[in-house]
């Protein structure tokens, strides 16, 4: 499937997903007596919000088609190349992995990987896809990522800019979750020790909670911590885009997700609550 087909399919599924959200909202309304009296969000407001997003996405997609040579998906492999492996049809859609990045992953060099990512980091150009492709070259991605987090106190100064290395930690663990990396017993035990250490630093700092929950999610440590406490941390990080991902991965059950939604609603954060409704 080409990139344009993937986008079109996702847009076509919006109505179906909105129906599921409507059912979740109706279930919530059935327990309205448990909600804060100040809760006044209506389905029409939610529907209007997502309809606006849908319209904007569809409009931009049509504009993309009108300005780019996608009609024939020219970036696909030509039929004349049919003699190549069938898997080559998708190769042009894969991100290019820089040789240095690939070499670091092949050598399982976590510290070198952190330094490299900090050096090339650009807020305007997300690295998720390239790192996801590169990390698959590592014989042991989970151990490499853990090495990077455990051993990094690196902050570049030659450029004169400060950088929060925790952003790289989160990126690496996001990718680890995405590729469903194998976690050995030794790596898991090391990660458990690090997670307890990081948990002690959380306090009321949402980004520390975000890193902690990624440790729990990426290294499959959900059973090592109290679920109620994990749910409280999810509330702390609800504003971050990764919140629902880690919530699902760490095993917060449906009952506690319901309580989380109620807490968000009572706190005047209905849009954040919607994220957890389906």
Swiss-Prot record:
Biological process terms in GO annotation: cell differentiation; flower development
Coiled-coil stretches noted in the UniProt entry, renumbered to this chain: 1-36
Keywords of this entry: Coiled coil, Developmental protein, Differentiation, Flowering
Pfam family of the protein (one): Frigida
Xref: PANTHER family: FRIGIDA-LIKE PROTEIN 1, FRIGIDA-LIKE PROTEIN 3-RELATED
Organism of this sequence: Arabidopsis thaliana
Function: Truncated inactive FRIGIDA-like 1 protein.
Note: In cv. Columbia and cv. Landsberg erecta, either FRL1 or FRL2, but not both, is functional and required for FRI-mediated up-regulation of FLC.
Database matches in InterPro entries: Frigida
The keyword Magnesium belongs to this UniProt entry's keyword annotation: no
Protein encoded by which gene: FRL1
Protein name stated in the entry: Truncated FRIGIDA-like protein 1
Homology family: Belongs to the Frigida family.
